[in-house]
Amino acid sequence: MERSFMKNNSSVNMTSWMGRVDHEDGELGLRWHQKVKVTNSTNQDGIMLLGFACDEGVIRNKGRKGAYAAPQVIRRALANLAWHHQSDVYDGGDIQCNDGDLELAQKQLGIKIKSALANRHQVIVLGGGHEVAWGSFQGIARYLQSRAVLTSPTPPPRIGIINFDAHFDLRNLSQSPSSSASQSSKQYGNSGTPFHQISEFCHVQHWPFHYACLGLNKGSNTQALYHKAKQLGVLHFDDIEMNLLNLPQIKQALSEFIEQNDFLYLTIDIDVFPASCAPGVSAPAVRGVSLDIIESLLPDILKAKNQHGESKLLLADLAEFNPTFDIDNQTARLVARLVWTIAHGMKSNM
């Protein structure tokens, strides 16, 4: 029987959570599809999965469409993975951008994230293009602003954004959704602008902007973007630097970055990986960063605690998976492994 619920452009469709059942192993043989639950207003202190079914930002950025379908494909890849987790996992459904109104979809995602965080969940968002990042940050900001109202006066929050990505995504907004000439004075975001939008928001709010971008393809980022990153104080490493020889230096820099922040937001653009293991993206990487390097850096992010012993990581999202161009579901399985690893690390000592 299909289990499906609709609310405010958000759907919960549990039909993707199907897979193998090992009755002979009892509780020790459970898999994700047997453990993930539908969210409701009474759920607290777990992990909330939210989908962002959207590739409008990729289309505006002249990329290859197809990321809209990613959240459900990721769920299907997750469904059959073995359950080794300590926390309940809830499915909060998808925010769907069906009409080109990216800004509304990002706002709705932010509202759902704020609600999940207020209910003491940590959140994993399944994108969608990397325009998801602006919606994710809106949710974090809404949550922290609501906390500040209750506990004011309070200093500005120090939010550390850690982005594994081949691109800075610091581009300026365009004057039209299609990036073509327009007489409109309104500016539009896309999949290449989210961290510019976040930096502008932080500037208006008088919040510090702390951004780390690891895995950059220098040939895909202009001098203007490197200059802008320097002006904004961005911590960054190019893909050619992301190797075992440099791993201690990178871990040290990341540790110092984590230490100076009260909260963390982790975002992984799947195009940071080599095309050989992640063909299903809008912009496949020629070189990329190996999975073993990125998995070596994740524990420090997932285990980071504040002075109260609470996890600094509020939210993680995964972006730019494009099932249209995947080969034998290998990118889907890669994304599922990352979600599995993040969810496991959020509620354990890894």
Curated annotation (Swiss-Prot):
Pathway of action: Amino-acid degradation; L-histidine degradation into L-glutamate; L-glutamate from N-formimidoyl-L-glutamate (hydrolase route): step 1/1
EC assignment: 3.5.3.8
Entries under InterPro entries matching the protein: HutG, Ureohydrolase, Ureohydrolase_dom_sf, Ureohydrolase_Mn_BS
Cofactor annotation: Mn(2+)
UniProtKB keywords: Histidine metabolism, Hydrolase, Manganese, Metal-binding
Source taxon at top rank: Bacteria
GO biological process: L-histidine catabolic process to glutamate and formamide; L-histidine catabolic process to glutamate and formate; putrescine biosynthetic process from arginine, via agmatine
Chain residues that bind Mn(2+) 2: 165, 167, 269, 271
Keyword Metal-binding: yes
Molecular-function GO term, any one: agmatinase activity
Database matches in HAMAP family: Formimidoylglutam (MF_00737)
Underlying gene: hutG
Biological source species: Aliivibrio fischeri (strain ATCC 700601 / ES114)
Record's protein name: Formimidoylglutamase
